[in-house]
Amino acid sequence: MNFGEAITAIKNGKKAYRQGWNGKNQYVELATRISYVNSSGIIINVKHDASGNNALAFVGTSGVQLGWLASQADMLAEDWDVRED
C-alpha cells in the first residue's frame, strides 16, 4: 500500500508500518487526547478539538516518538502495510 492509504488506515485506528523498516515491531499510530507535563510538573490536557488534538506516534524499539514526521522516502514508498493487532 502507499503512504496515502497508510494514513487513511491510521486515521481509522489501525497501526501502519513499512516492510522496509529495519526494526521489528515498529509502527505508526494515531495519538489522541494529547497531554503533557509542563516545567512546573503540572499535567496539561490539550482540549482544543477545533484546531486538532491528534498527532502521529512512531512506536519503535526505543519507545514512542510523538509528532513523527515521515521522510520523503516514507511518503513515496509502496511497501506500507497494516498490523492486525
Please give the residue ranges for each predicted region.
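Extracellular/periplasmic catalytic domains that process cell-envelope and extracellular macromolecules
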Residues: D49-A50
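Catalytic phosphate/metal-binding cores of nucleic-acid and nucleotide-processing enzymes, i.e., regions
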Residues: M1-V46, F58, M75
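Short, compact, well-ordered microdomains
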Residues: N53-D85
